[in-house]
């Protein structure tokens, strides 16, 4: 039989507590921890000479233990006649000065200002269970009355939201409010489902109210107090600690590869995020060495967006290859300084050990793993704010291949790389104009952002490579026709790598880009080497409106129209493009804007199979011939949609495509002093009819 109240109403019922204590008899029920787990914080705020009122004392041994270590001015009150009688009998001989009285905590009858401390162990929680909190409010008012100026209300509580909110809002004016979180202090014999952390609320009475709220939170009994600006911030911080403790409770219950909880560790002083930890358990069927219980993997700085670390599938693969029962994957945050691997290990060790799987031996050595043994490298080189997408960061990072990469990150989705370009040193860029680069050649890290430039002949995104390769479907006669150069309309600029590549390497190609966000254009020009000229232009505006305007004018046609635009609505199962871009009405406008040889290319990122089928059905209703090229390891696929099936059958890949791909490869290489690093044939190898 559970001895914890089963419903909230029972907490405030005198009859319930009367029955409860009769059932317990001589066995003390240490409500919310015992003296040993609480003495550190109690001695901090209660002095042996203080006059202490213990409200709702129950048959806890806490008062007896305080008495035995020198606290002799303890007055204990409780609503239960049974417990008061029992406690007086139990202490009559051994503790003659320890008194227990049957009194209502809301009307004690004591003189105002007659106590230095009021000690409460769970009584507030019991009384606050009423919906309106009226009973608890009357008790807190009585506490304020009987305490002297400088006196303290010390309340041991589970800090459920309605309880802590009531107490803090009651004392915030005219009192200093401090909360200690004693996570993990519960009695080992407590119910296994009883996983909430214990908090100690300390409210100090001022003679004169300060001009500002004094609200503080401490971790543990000796943690430095962190000042909070509002009641809402304090309540939020308490809630975070509770959520963390509940997560720990679940993690100690067993391993579960389908659940990947994560938490963020913040800097104690600044409150800024410092580490993000993701817990990845191995599957039950995994064959792991007996001693491989637990390991910590440090993601190199700047690599947290990589598929292996930034996706659920990638993390599962990482855990499987590491061969541990549980792997904690740690990502470091930008704007934080990290000395070295040893310093990071020392900083993380006290926290990560709380995340260990059940059954791990106490003396088990826990390894810290990483790639290359260092912390990686990241340099934030630019920041800004977009009215459309919020804050952004431009940063240079070192990739797994040793090259440096420049990334555009929007902070509202910091795990996603919006745009990426490979970098080369100024010296390498200069020599590249004289000599073609070797694809596998590596370069040393440059000393500063100004010494690094974007390698415009390298496309980081595979779906961009597929789009370039798709130009082969136009035929080489069209690509090499200088009298009628290939015209391209691209919706979605990003860092500008794709349109810049087409302009630089496709003979005489003319590219028009439509971009909604002027900040994105500025970033592309400032940091990603994007250059507007007579063959590469940008129109700022809504892509849907621009296509509608072009279609209504009926004066311009394009050989290629590309959609490479993401959706800001994360609730949909499709992140590229926004749904409006694949409505039948718009697809028909795209069709009408294409030349007879025209090609429509769509970057499709859709996790919802039913939604994907709906998109494909709509595309098929407009275009007679549709091909798909999936991207390995990603959800992306590129749809290549022909305006006309031409000479080949609409349900087969053209037999001449491979030869055209080889010819396009030669043309791209011949059209520039620097060879573009792209394999056109490989990009078209897995083309499928859909």
Swiss-Prot record:
<feature type="compositionally biased region" description="Basic residues">
    <location>
        <begin position="433"/>
        <end position="442"/>
    </location>
</feature>
<keyword id="KW-0511">Multifunctional enzyme</keyword>
<keyword id="KW-0808">Transferase</keyword>
<dbReference type="GO" id="GO:0032259">
    <property type="term" value="P:methylation"/>
</dbReference>
<dbReference type="InterPro" id="IPR051419">
    <property type="entry name" value="Lys/N-term_MeTrsfase_sf"/>
</dbReference>
<protein>
    <recommendedName>
        <fullName>eEF1A lysine and N-terminal methyltransferase</fullName>
        <ecNumber>2.1.1.-</ecNumber>
    </recommendedName>
</protein>
<dbReference type="GO" id="GO:0016279">
    <property type="term" value="F:protein-lysine N-methyltransferase activity"/>
</dbReference>
<comment type="similarity">
    <text>Belongs to the methyltransferase superfamily.</text>
</comment>
<dbReference type="InterPro" id="IPR029063">
    <property type="entry name" value="SAM-dependent_MTases_sf"/>
</dbReference>
<dbReference type="Pfam" id="PF01564">
    <property type="entry name" value="Spermine_synth"/>
</dbReference>
<dbReference type="InterPro" id="IPR041698">
    <property type="entry name" value="Methyltransf_25"/>
</dbReference>
<keyword id="KW-0489">Methyltransferase</keyword>
<dbReference type="Pfam" id="PF13649">
    <property type="entry name" value="Methyltransf_25"/>
</dbReference>
<comment type="function">
    <text>Dual methyltransferase that catalyzes methylation of elongation factor 1-alpha (eef1a1 and eef1a2) at two different positions, and is therefore involved in the regulation of mRNA translation. Via its C-terminus, methylates the N-terminus of eef1a1 and eef1a2. Via its N-terminus dimethylates lysine residues of eef1a1 and eef1a2.</text>
</comment>
<feature type="region of interest" description="Disordered">
    <location>
        <begin position="427"/>
        <end position="451"/>
    </location>
</feature>
């Amino acid at each position: 039989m559970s001895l914890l109240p089963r419903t909230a109403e029972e907490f405030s019922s005198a009859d319930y507590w009367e029955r409860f204590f009769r059932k317990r008899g001589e066995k003390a029920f240490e409500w919310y921890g015992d003296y040993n787990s609480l003495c550190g914080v109690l001695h901090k705020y209660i002095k042996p000479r203080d006059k202490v009122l213990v409200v709702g004392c129950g048959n806890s041994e806490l008062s007896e233990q305080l008495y035995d270590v020198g606290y002799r001015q303890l007055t204990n009150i409780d609503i239960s006649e049974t417990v008061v009688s029992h406690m007086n009998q139990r202490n009559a001989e051994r503790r003659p000065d320890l008194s227990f009285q049957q009194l209502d905590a809301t009307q004690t009858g004591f003189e105002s200002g007659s106590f230095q401390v009021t000690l409460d162990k769970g009584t507030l929680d019991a009384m606050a269970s009423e919906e309106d909190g009226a009973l608890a409010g009357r008790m807190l008012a009585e506490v304020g009355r009987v305490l002297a100026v400088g006196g303290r209300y010390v309340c041991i509580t589970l800090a459920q939201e309605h309880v802590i909110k009531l107490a803090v809002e009651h004392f915030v004016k005219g009192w200093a409010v401090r909360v200690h979180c004693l996570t993990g202090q519960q009695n080992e014999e407590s119910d296994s489902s009883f996983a909430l952390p214990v908090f100690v609320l300390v409210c100090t009475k001022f003679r004169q109210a300060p001009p500002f709220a004094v609200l503080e939170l401490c971790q543990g009994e000796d943690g430095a107090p962190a000042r909070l600006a509002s009641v809402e911030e304090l309540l939020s911080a308490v809630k975070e600690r509770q959520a963390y403790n509940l997560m720990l409770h679940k993690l100690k219950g067993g391993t579960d590869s389908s659940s990947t909880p994560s938490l963020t560790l913040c800097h104690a002083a600044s409150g800024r995020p410092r580490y993000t930890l993701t817990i990845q358990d191995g599957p039950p069927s995994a064959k792991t060495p007996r001693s491989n219980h637990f390991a910590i993997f440090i993601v190199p700085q700047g690599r947290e967006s990589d598929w292996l670390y930034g996706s659920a599938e990638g993390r599962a693969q990482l855990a499987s290859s590491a061969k541990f029962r549980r792997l904690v994957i740690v990502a470091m945050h930008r704007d934080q300084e990290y000395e070295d691997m040893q310093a990071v290990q020392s900083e993380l060790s006290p926290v990560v050990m709380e995340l260990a799987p059940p059954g791990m031996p106490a003396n088990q050595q826990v390894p810290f793993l990483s790639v290359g043994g260092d912390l990686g490298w990241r340099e934030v080189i630019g920041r800004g704010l977009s009215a459309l997408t919020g804050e952004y960061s431009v940063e240079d990072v070192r990739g797994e291949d040793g090259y440096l990469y420049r990334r555009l990150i929007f902070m509202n989705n910091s795990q996603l790389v919006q745009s990426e370009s490979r970098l080369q040193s100024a010296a390498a860029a200069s020599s590249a104009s004289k000599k073609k680069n070797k694809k596998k050649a590596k370069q040393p890290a440059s000393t500063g952002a100004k010494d690094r430039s974007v390698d415009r002949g390298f496309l980081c995104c595979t779906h961009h490579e597929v789009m370039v390769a798709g130009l082969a479907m136009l035929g080489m006669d069209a690509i090499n026709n200088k009298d009628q150069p290939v015209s391209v309309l691209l919706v979605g600029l990003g860092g500008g790598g794709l349109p810049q590549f087409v302009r630089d390497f496709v003979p005489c190609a003319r590219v028009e880009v439509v971009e909604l966000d002027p900040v994105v254009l500025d970033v592309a020009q400032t940091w990603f080497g994007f250059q507007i000229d007579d063959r590469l232009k940008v129109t700022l505006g809504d892509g849907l409106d621009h296509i509608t305007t072009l279609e209504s004018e009926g004066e311009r046609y394009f050989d290629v129209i590309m959609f490479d635009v993401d959706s800001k609505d994360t609730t949909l199962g499709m992140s590229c493009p926004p749904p409006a871009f694949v409505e039948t009405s718009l697809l028909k406008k795209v069709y009408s804007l294409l030349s007879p040889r025209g090609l429509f290319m769509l970057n499709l990122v859709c996790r919802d199979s039913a939604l994907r089928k709906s998109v494909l059905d709509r595309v098929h209703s407009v275009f007679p011939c549709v091909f798909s090229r999936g991207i390995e390891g990603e959800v992306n696929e590129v749809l290549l949609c022909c305006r006309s099936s031409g000479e080949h059958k609409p349900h087969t890949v053209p037999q001449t495509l491979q030869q055209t791909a080889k010819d396009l490869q030669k043309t791209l290489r011949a059209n520039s002093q620097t060879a573009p690093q792209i394999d056109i044939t490989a990009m078209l190898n897995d083309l499928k009819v859909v």
